[in-house]
Amino acid sequence: MNVGVAHSEVNPNTRVMSSRGIWLAYVISVAALHVILLSIPFFSIPVVWTLTNVIHNLVMYLLLHTVKGTPFETPDQGKDRLLTHWEQIDYGMQCTSSRKFLSISPVVLYLLTSFYIKYDPAHFMINTASLLSVLLPKLPQFHGVRVFGINKY
């Protein structure tokens, strides 16, 4: 271990999801969100599951697919300033373990939500739209694509 030595990453965003414990922290934060919503007395169980799913997907979309660039001064001469955080993860390589985890977790939450809402049509449509809005940008075909020019600059 090199104490006092700076990291060797040009862009620290590329390896953050591969850090030790980040997946556990992610699961714990989703569970904490669900427990907090459950503690609100006037929410029914289907509403809590739908809110958990929608809030999770909204936060995931905002943090991974709208935030661009890096929060650090990096020596990459601005190569990553037009890339979203999702496009920077694992240096843009597709099908890595971090990308698989971040793609599968909304699906697992969607399946749990669908089960606990007992496939109520209104909740089901909201949850399906929420899932599609967060899964479609993760597809390899959309790497670097800005639909309708949204988030282009």
UniProtKB/Swiss-Prot annotation:
Chain ranges on the Extracellular side, renumbered to this chain: 127-153
Localization of this protein: Endoplasmic reticulum membrane
Topology of the protein relative to the lipid bilayer: Multi-pass membrane protein
InterPro entries: ORMDL (IPR007203)
Keywords associated with the record: Endoplasmic reticulum, Membrane, Transmembrane, Transmembrane helix
Protein family per UniProt: Belongs to the ORM family.
Entry remark concerning the domains of this protein: Ceramides bind to ORMDL3 N-terminus and stabilize it in a conformation that physically restricts the accessibility of the substrates to their binding sites in the serine palmitoyltransferase (SPT) complex, hence inhibiting SPT catalytic activity. In the absence of ceramides, the N-terminus is flexible and permits substrate binding, thus liberating SPT from inhibition.
Function of the molecule: Plays an essential role in the homeostatic regulation of sphingolipid de novo biosynthesis by modulating the activity of the serine palmitoyltransferase (SPT) in response to ceramide levels. When complexed to SPT, the binding of ceramides to its N-terminus stabilizes a conformation that block SPT substrate entry, hence preventing SPT catalytic activity. Through this mechanism, maintains ceramide levels at sufficient concentrations for the production of complex sphingolipids, but which prevents the accumulation of ceramides to levels that trigger apoptosis.
The protein, known as: ORM1-like protein 2
